[in-house]
Curated annotation (Swiss-Prot):
It comes from Gallus gallus (Chicken). It is found in: Cytoplasm; Nucleus. InterPro entries: eIF3e (IPR016650), eIF3e_N (IPR019010), PCI_dom (IPR000717), WH_DNA-bd_sf (IPR036390). This is Eukaryotic translation initiation factor 3 subunit E. It comes from the Eukaryota. Component of the eukaryotic translation initiation factor 3 (eIF-3) complex, which is involved in protein synthesis of a specialized repertoire of mRNAs and, together with other initiation factors, stimulates binding of mRNA and methionyl-tRNAi to the 40S ribosome. The eIF-3 complex specifically targets and initiates translation of a subset of mRNAs involved in cell proliferation.
Amino acid sequence: MAEYDLTTKIAHFLDRHLVFPLLEFLSVKEIYNEKELLQGKLDLLSDTNMVDFAMDVYKNLYSDEIPHALREKRTTVVAQLKQLQAETEPIVKMFEDPETTRQMQSTRDGRMLFDYLAEKHGFRQEYLDTLYRYAKFQYECGNYSGAAEYLYFFRVLVPATDRNALSSLWGKLASEVLMQNWDAAMEDLTRLKETIDNNSVSSPLQSLQQRTWLIHWSLFVFFNHPKGRDNIIDLFLYQPQYLNAIQTMCPHILRYLTTAVITNKDVRKRRQVLKDLVKVIQQESYTYRDPITEFVECLYVNFDFDGAQKKLRECETVLVNDFFLVACLEDFIENARLFIFETFCRIHQCISIGMLADKLNMTPEEAERWIVNLIRNARLDAKLDSELGHVVMGNNAVSPYQQVIEKTKSLSFRSQMLAMNIEKKLNQSGRSEAPNWATQDSGFY
């Protein structure tokens, strides 16, 4: 369903290598014409050194012989790779030394490690540039494991002020994502975020751009790492600089934040967060909306249960065709039904099972079994009267203390949103090309 596909918007903020998995996914889903997707892959590959991959794509796209320019490029890439391997081999051998490995694991100070290598192995400053160039070349060739290894060596040796320090962090994160090493990718994501947040050299606009890129790159990690759906809420909703970036540069990210909230396994946290999420969705509804955000609006703003049920059916189509969200489908539908049920029950103290079945798009028998399971698993304070076919809700009285906490949180959040809106109006809105790590000489500027 191309209408709700965000691939083009998201790709604008990604390194070209990170776009390939998205195109492969679209190819399987058959949302777009296959030849258009192949041409898109070929265009992306033109600025990489993955020549063999480009040749395979060209063969699938065209029946004629592979262009001479591609064959020449392959010869050039192989020659460059051999030259860089020869230059880097002595450096790599230093890191293979067991004592060097021990020093790297025990020493947190890059300067001390550099001095140790200089004293024991004759390591020189220019070796860092050689190591960085080789790591980047490996990445351009699609050897992400090699790139990650050499970028790790580079990172532990260079100071934060090095001209390639920030660029190497982007490269390391991309490499781990493309190898699907989610624990390592989460560590790299955290390290990169800290670097961006503590960077006093970048202008406010540059920091905004960096955070926007980080938001998009983080989707790979957050929707694959076990703790991802908690972390995405904390980062996107409760860290003002990142919520501001979403509202200013990429409101389409609300789809992913909303899905993370709805599918979060912590029931208590999910209910608390929903109130804050609804406010953001309402505020940004004029800039972005899709069935997922509209489902929340229907249910929690308009209390339109028929509309919510209709949007839930549309959500299934959106989730199935979204690269990042396809694995969330089952959790989303289950929790969305629970939300409809809970909201409906807050309005009606006693509800017939038949009416509930209609609202949840189930048969009465399915609805009864579903409610029994909710009560059994302590997710619902209610009693079921099977003879009358009624569900009677329990009385969940909220203490005055809890009411004060909720009102204080609400005021704090509203103040935060007001401050962000003022900042948004004052800031000059600007967009930039995504950080294409593999094709930059140094950094992204």
